[in-house]
Amino acid sequence: MNKITVRALTPSIGASVEGVKLGALDAETFSAIRHAFLDRCMLVFPGQNLQPAEQMAFAKMWGDIAVTPMITYSEGWPGLLQLVNPGKEMAITENWHYDSTFIAAPHALTILAAQEMPAAGGDTMWCNMYLAYERLSPGMQRMLSGLRAKFTGTRIARRSGIVGEPPHAFHPVVRTHPETGRKALFIGHPGDTVPCFENMTEAESRPLLDWIYEHAVSPDRIYRHIWQPGDVVMWDNRCTMHYAVHDHGEAVRNLNRVTIRGSVPV
């Protein structure tokens, strides 16, 4: 087993993992990384410089590679998506969100490998949604536990040029993590991502959706990552939302993304 160092990035979320090469993991080292991942919700591995084959091999240790509707993947690498700078007008991730909530079984986790990054800007933020739930009053927890919300793929459909009704799915607003057993708020940006609760109108839903969203992303449960080329970051899509900040103009920002299939939220 490699001797790894796990250092918390904030009290609430995130850890930096050093002393390991993700392209050459033994079973014991992977087990230690998995434990840290489930505990800290997202991990940063500096200086990895992963090639696509290495990233795919590491991803497959976590489960089956996910392929999402409306996304075009890299030729020769099914499931590997090259993220490039689309310009601020076309950026669809500049809000707090979970990945692929418009499908019945959203991704379990996401792995990003930084290739070429701006000299400044282009940061990504993550928020601990366990804490967002746990810091609600008992009364609010009880009320939300029975609610389901509509999640749409409006933003990605618009960018993909798809007309008509965007794909959507209904999920519980409070979900239980299938591995840790902890409860997390499961929401998204009110309006275009989460327009309403199930069996409620948008007008009826919006005040509570706005309040939940603002409550969830309190600064005391957020980590903001300043990317360096070669970084690998992975996060748990069952208990964290993230936000990609587009403040870098036309500067080059290239990352490779792989996601792992998840289960239907309950």
Describe the residue ranges of each PLM region.
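Non-heme Fe(II) oxygenase catalytic core, chiefly the N-lobe of the double-stranded beta-helix
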Residues: 2-232, 237-266
